Design a protein with these regions (language model features):
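Aromatic- and glycine-rich beta-strand/loop motifs that create alpha-glucan
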Residues: 1-22
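Alpha-helical transmembrane segments of multi-pass membrane transporters/translocases
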Residues: 2, 23, 212-248
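Membrane-helix interface segments
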Residues: 16-19, 89-95, 170-174
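Hydrophobic alpha-helical membrane-insertion segments
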Residues: 22-27, 99-117, 175-192
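Secretory targeting signals
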Residues: 29-69, 95-166, 208-228
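Transmembrane helix segments
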Residues: 31-39, 165-203
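Hydrophobic/aromatic residues in alpha-helical transmembrane segments
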Residues: 63-67, 76, 80, 115, ...
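Transmembrane helix boundary and interhelical loop/hinge segments in multi-pass membrane proteins
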Residues: 67-86, 90, 248
């Protein structure tokens, strides 16, 4: 397992995008920090900081691309057969890919948090990120809460992406998910149990920023965390099961 994880990490680090994209994203975060200094009525320093200067969104985009190719490229180049010839089990192979993706996603999110703190101190040196008042969390704790919610929400998307990459056609999936998103919005008010559907779970990324969004999701933040973790577990188990049965 350890050898496979090292190999998967090597494949990712060998790609130029693994290093170039984070640099570009950090520059975009710096740009947003600068814009916030010029248009602070539109982009307040507090909101810009707690949203990590949109850094989580950029890194989430990169992670989705990496998740969509981490399995498919093995089949495209035929390297999957080489791994099987080396007597690695299919379960070990797919689990090593999931662990690698988790490691790189954790690294990206830590980079985003550190970059946000540096950018905040660079452009808003009078911003106290440690001070809290009443029931209001400090800006740093708000950033950490948003990062946790976004991390969980992104992993729900990543687990779906891995499931898709293992089993189905992406076009069909995204078309179906778009239709379901419209339907769930219309029916959520009428059918209470629909609030537990996976598409609604993705709203955790919005609700960590805006607590009032619970009126739309019909769920409290802790319920969204539980629902996301449950779906992520189910989807990843399905990924392992389908990969074991997949024709190679």
């Amino acid at each position: 397992m350890g050898t496979l994880i090292k190999q998967e990490c090597f494949k990712l680090f060998k790609k130029k995008s693994t290093f170039i994209a984070p640099i570009v994203f950090i520059l975009l975060m710096v740009a947003q920090g600068y814009i916030a200094t010029k248009y602070n009525k539109i982009f307040t320093p507090q909101e810009s900081f707690t949203s990590a200067y949109n850094g989580f969104s950029w890194f989430a985009f990169l992670l989705i691309i990496q998740a969509s190719t981490i399995i498919s490229m093995e089949f495209h180049y035929g390297t999957i057969k080489n791994l099987l010839y080396r007597e690695y089990s299919r379960t070990t192979m797919i689990v090593s890919k999931i662990i690698t993706l988790f490691i790189i996603s954790l690294i990206y999110f830590v980079i985003t948090i550190i970059a946000s703190i540096v950018i905040g101190s660079l452009f808003f040196n009078d911003l106290n990120i440690f001070e809290s008042s009443g029931n209001q969390l400090s800006l740093l704790n708000q950033l950490l809460l948003v990062s946790l919610g976004t991390f969980v929400g992104v992993w729900l998307v990543l687990s779906l992406t891995l499931l898709l990459s293992s089993a189905t056609n992406s076009t069909v999936f995204y078309l179906a998910s778009s239709i379901l998103a419209v339907i769930q919005t219309a029916l959520l008010e009428k059918i209470d149990w629909l609030k537990w559907n996976p598409i609604n779970m993705m709203n955790i990324m919005l609700q960590t920023v805006e607590k009032g969004f619970s009126k739309s999701t019909k769920l409290e933040l802790h319920e969204l965390f539980i629902g996301n973790i449950a779906y992520i577990s189910i989807f990843l188990i399905l990924v392992v099961f389908i990969f074991k049965k997949k024709n190679i």
